């Protein structure tokens, strides 16, 4: 994976292009949001993000990216803008118009081809 590849992934994610960012996931990818949530499988991750995107606009602003042979590290700021009330959102109730920002460091493990994510771990540290 090159930095341009990773930036294409983030761009597709920001546009809610599920096919575009989903192509970077291995079929059996594991996604962990700290200790709060674990999702296994590309289709389950995409279903999670479809639900999120029905309620929130999520935009990633890259602050730093490091590319290794089998890993990618990312530091980013993510802005969540609530589009419709979501009282039972698992990360805290939110109402239309709310804007939340968090900073995250994420670690991506790559398959043997170096093209698809097999494990994603994200840890939020701000706020």
What is each residue range found by the language model?
Residues 16-28, 32:
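Short, well-ordered alpha-helical segments enriched in acidic and aromatic residues
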């Amino acid at each position: 994976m090159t930095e341009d590849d990773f930036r294409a992934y983030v761009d597709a994610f920001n546009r809610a292009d599920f096919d575009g960012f989903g192509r970077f996931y291995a079929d059996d990818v594991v996604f962990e949001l700290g200790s709060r949530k674990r999702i296994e499988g590309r289709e389950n991750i995409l279903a999670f993000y479809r639900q999120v995107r029905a309620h929130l606009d999520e935009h990633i602003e890259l602050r730093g990216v490091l590319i290794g042979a089998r890993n990618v590290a990312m530091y980013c700021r993510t802005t969540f803008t609530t589009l419709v009330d979501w009282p039972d959102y698992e990360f805290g109730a939110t109402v239309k118009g709310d804007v939340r920002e968090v900073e995250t460091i994420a670690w991506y493990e790559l398959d043997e081809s170096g093209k698809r994510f097999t494990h994603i771990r994200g840890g939020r540290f701000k706020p």
